A protein has these predicted regions:
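TRNA-recognition modules of translation machinery and tRNA-sensing kinases, especially anticodon-binding
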Residues: 51-183
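N-terminal alpha-helical targeting/anchoring segments
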Residues: 1-55, 73, 77
Length: 183
């Protein structure tokens, strides 16, 4: 073949090898920081801080679903009707409690020096790959194929991608961001 055909063949081979390399690299997990304790289950988690007095409720403690029903805070049946299992509808005081808790935690983060963001609820595939969501969780993420956008699982995905591709200086760290999304 001609030199042009040979170059074209080698270009295609290089693209294929580069894609194989990227696919392999995307399967490698991120290493946790050395300060992160190692464990096999949630029992191995380390409590970092506790606040306030914990009342001893003894046998009078009720599970959250009973409290939600008793005080009409969450309508599980409406959630099933609208979206299916696992999508509760917060109503009345339950909706107010949800909003108050969100505000409480955002205010705490702000007081600790975190910058608050309201990020988009969908991201492109590069953003999904940038946080390890893709390809690992591809089948578990809602995907709008028309726009090739993915529904985020947490605010972490878009917030982390604010710095995707940037070279950060050690003097600029840590970068403290927070955000709330209903995702």
């Amino acid at each position: 073949g001609s030199l042009k055909e040979r170059i074209q063949t080698l270009d295609e081979k290089q693209k294929s090898l580069m894609q194989q390399q990227e696919d392999t690299l995307l399967e490698l997990p991120n290493r946790p920081h050395d300060s992160v304790p190692s464990g096999q289950s949630e029992e191995d988690n380390e409590v970092v801080a506790e606040e306030g007095d914990k009342p001893d409720l003894g046998n009078s403690a009720k599970p959250h679903w009973d409290l939600a029903d008793q005080y009409k805070l969450i309508d599980f049946e409406a959630g099933v009707k609208i979206s299916g299992a696992g999508f509760p509808v917060y109503r009345g005081k339950g909706a107010k409690l949800q909003r108050a808790l969100i505000q409480f935690f955002l205010d705490r983060a702000d007081a600790a020096g975190y910058e608050e963001f309201i990020p988009p609820h969908v991201v492109n595939a590069d953003s999904g790959r940038g946080t390890g969501q893709l390809p690992d969780k591809e089948g578990q993420m809602y995907h709008c194929t028309e726009d090739d956008l993915y529904l985020i699982p947490t605010a972490e995905v878009p917030l982390t991608n604010l710095y995707r591709g940037d070279l950060l200086k050690a003097d600029d760290l840590p970068i403290q961001l927070c955000g709330y999304t209903p995702c």
